[in-house]
């Protein structure tokens, strides 16, 4: 009788998407392996910015107790120099093509015409063309998470670009990519927005005003991590953390690694010998495939 009950429970869990081969595979990914792979991805980021390609001016550092003050304490933009050569690299160009595909207000339905879907495919493929992207796939493949690169790419596409409703539960107005890398406005405030490339683009367009920072990581080369306060097109962000100077493929890879192996949890990584926590969130109100969850958010944890 006990065996029958266990079998029935297992079948129920499988049908609800709570128990599948992916869960079993991820049980074999240790914290030490995540830290080791994150160091490898860090070293393989050949498209990261160099000191001559990127120069920032963080200016005013404030205590975490003052992040909500909304005061502009930095008269100059955050980004002083960004090399056009850096931004013309294939993964950067593919990433930049995606940034104007979204409506910032939640509640406004996102349309995805065929050319925008092609841009999604292009960015993912450009990422897989890098040694960094290949290393991430090879690791997950070795753990039995994905059987082929095409399966991996298809899952990344749904995970990051699949649409869901962040407003009324009906309007498909958001995606993980939009929230994390482009940013959204919800409840009169900036939500998401964890990409330095998007930050720079908006500063250059004159629609983003950098206020201050409350955290500056220990790294002396790029990528670094900043926790920032800023105003985006009239809306305030109390604390927006982001990698600064990493390539777009590194952003995608490190967040994907943490989301796939530690979904909805704090994920401990190691970059250049320094420890860092990355927080991911699952979007639990809708799913794709066999009960898989879209990525809701991901960002570096800053005090």
UniProtKB/Swiss-Prot annotation:
Compartments where located: Secreted
The EC number(s) this enzyme carries: 4.6.1.-
InterPro entries given in the database record: ENDOU, EndoU-like, EndoU_C
PROSITE patterns attached to this UniProt entry: ENDOU
Active-site residues per Swiss-Prot or TrEMBL entry: 179, 194, 237
Any one of the GO CC terms: extracellular region
Reactions the enzyme catalyzes: ribonucleotidyl-uridine-RNA = a 5'-end dephospho-uridine-RNA + a 3'-end 2',3'-cyclophospho-ribonucleotide-RNA
Similarity field: Belongs to the ENDOU family.
Assembly and oligomerization: Monomer.
Role description: Endoribonuclease that cleaves single-stranded RNAs at 5' of uridylates and releases a product with a 2',3'-cyclic phosphate at the 3'-end. The UU and GU sites are more efficiently cleaved than CU and AU sites.
UniProt-recorded name of the protein: Uridylate-specific endoribonuclease A
Gene from which the chain derives: endoua
């Amino acid at each position: 009788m006990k065996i029958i009950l266990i079998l029935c429970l297992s079948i129920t869990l499988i049908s609800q998407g709570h128990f599948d081969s992916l869960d079993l595979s991820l049980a074999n990914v240790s914290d030490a392996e995540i830290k080791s792979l994150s160091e490898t991805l860090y070293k393989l980021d050949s498209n990261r910015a160099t000191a001559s390609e990127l120069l920032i001016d963080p200016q005013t550092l404030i205590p975490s107790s003052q992040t909500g003050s909304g005061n502009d304490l930095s008269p100059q933009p955050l980004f002083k120099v960004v090399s056009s050569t850096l931004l013309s690299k294939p993964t950067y160009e593919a990433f930049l093509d995606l940034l104007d595909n979204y409506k910032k207000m939640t509640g406004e339905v996102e349309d995805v015409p065929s050319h925008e879907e092609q841009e999604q495919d292009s960015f993912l493929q450009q990422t897989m063309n890098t040694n960094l992207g290949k290393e991430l796939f090879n690791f997950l493949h070795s753990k039995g998470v994905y059987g082929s690169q095409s399966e991996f790419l298809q899952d990344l596409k749904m995970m990051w670009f699949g649409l869901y409703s962040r407003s009324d539960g009906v309007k498909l107005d958001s995606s993980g990519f939009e929230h994390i890398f482009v940013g959204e406005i919800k409840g009169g405030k900036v939500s998401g927005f964890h990409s330095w490339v998007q930050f720079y683009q908006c500063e250059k367009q004159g629609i983003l005003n950098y206020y201050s920072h409350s955290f500056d990581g220990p790294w002396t080369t790029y990528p670094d991590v900043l926790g920032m306060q800023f105003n985006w097109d009239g809306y305030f962000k109390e604390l927006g953390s982001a990698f600064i100077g990493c390539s777009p493929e590194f952003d995608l890879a490190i967040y994907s690694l943490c989301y796939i192996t530690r979904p909805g949890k704090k994920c401990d990584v190691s970059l250049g010998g320094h420890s860092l926590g990355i927080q991911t969130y699952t979007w639990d109100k809708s799913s794709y495939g066999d009960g898989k969850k879209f990525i809701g958010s991901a960002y570096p944890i800053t005090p």
